Structure formats: structure tokens, C-alpha cells
Swiss-Prot record:
This is Large ribosomal subunit protein uL15. Signal peptide: none annotated. Keywords: Ribonucleoprotein, Ribosomal protein, RNA-binding, rRNA-binding. NCBIfam families: rplO_bact. GO terms for molecular function: rRNA binding; structural constituent of ribosome. Binds to the 23S rRNA. It comes from Coxiella burnetii (strain RSA 493 / Nine Mile phase I). Part of the 50S ribosomal subunit. GO terms for cellular component: cytosolic large ribosomal subunit. GO terms for biological process: translation. Residues 20-52 are annotated as: Disordered. Belongs to the universal ribosomal protein uL15 family. Residues 30-39 have a biased composition (Basic residues).
Amino acid sequence: MQLNDLKPAKGARHQKLRVGRGIGSGKGKTAGRGHKGQHSRAGGYHKVGFEGGQMPLQRRVPKFGFTSRKELISAEVRLGELNKISGDVVDLASLKAANIISRQIKRVKIFAAGKLEKPVTIRGLRVTKGVKAAVEAAGGKIE
């Protein structure tokens, strides 16, 4: 076998169907579009979600819930990320200085993911039970 002998397997590639080319083709005259109506004409189509004038589904179902504004100023930090902080005190300012959280964040919760490799003092931040155990096991404390 040579490179110039390569060809796709039989039946792997289909020829493009040419519509509107006579009744013998099986797709002549209306070219599979049916008779009249919006879908038979060129250029006309409805917008997504339009149901022909009937009240659409997204307007029939009731609204629910809301987006909390606290989400914009809250962040979650992994326990393993505390190793990036140079000092031994972890607070909001030190997390911002180490580029772990953005400047607009005002509420932080630390959750147990990763390993803590040094004793740290966590000040003014919320922590999970797993983090509390891990920090105390590493010789640190939570204030």
C-alpha cells in the first residue's frame, strides 16, 4: 500500500444531496420543504422560543429565586492555597496581597482541599470543621 492508494472505506463518505433537480431525483419541485408556509420560503424563520403566537414556555412558567448580592463579595479558598502566603497570619489582607482573592472580596470561607504544610494563624475568616482540624494538627490556630 502506498500513500497515493489511500481512500476512505466504502460507505464512509456520502455525496451531498442536490435538491430541486427534477422529479427523478426524489427531491425535485419543492426540494423537501413541503408546500407553502414560512418554512418553504427563503429567508423567513422564527426566533428561538417562538411558539407561533402561543405564550412561550419561558413566559408560562413562574419566576423563582434571586441572585444574592453577597455572591459578588464572597469567595471560597482552598486550604492548600494558604501555603502561598509568605507570613504566618492569614487574614483578608494577606489573601489579597498573595493574589488568592480579588480586591472586591469582603467575605471568605476556607474549605479543606489540599494540604497545609506550615503552621498558620487564621484571623477573621470562616472555616469548615475539616480546616479547623487540619490547622490545629499543623500547629496553627484560628482566632
